[in-house]
Amino acid sequence: MSENRHTFEMEELISSTGKGDDPLSVLLLANEGYTAGCCADYIRAIRNNSSHEVTVRNPIPTSRLDKLLGRPRVGLKDEQGRDYDVVIIHYSICILIRDYVPRYLRKSLRAFKGIKIQVIQDEYRWVNR
């Protein structure tokens, strides 16, 4: 098991942003078109019930042309060009599939200095990778 895994209390993570009681800007990478209804409910619940500003983006191409043209291009900055405070990767975005998380986004996620959270649903999926 990797020694790079850390567990923090949510309050500790939030205090590290320096925003105090201000809402955080959160990017939720998720596939809202996922076929399971519970998945869409989960994504909606995060977006609609959070006290923070949550933006949902789907980095998965929807067509062969999108894939060839590198669309959609999801950045880690909001509409005003500011870095998000938090990036959440929902389980509908399988990070082990290159088409789901393109190279440019992997590079951006590695360099991202904010809070990164990955929500895993199936803990038995490819446990050897």
Regions found by a protein language model. Give the residues of each.
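N-terminal acidic, proline/glycine-rich, low-complexity intrinsically disordered segments
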Residues: M1-T7
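Compositionally biased regions
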Residues: E3, S16-T17
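Extended catalytic core of nucleotide-activated donor transferases of GT-like folds
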Residues: F8-E9, I14, L27-R129
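A short, charged/proline- and glycine-enriched loop
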Residues: T17-V26
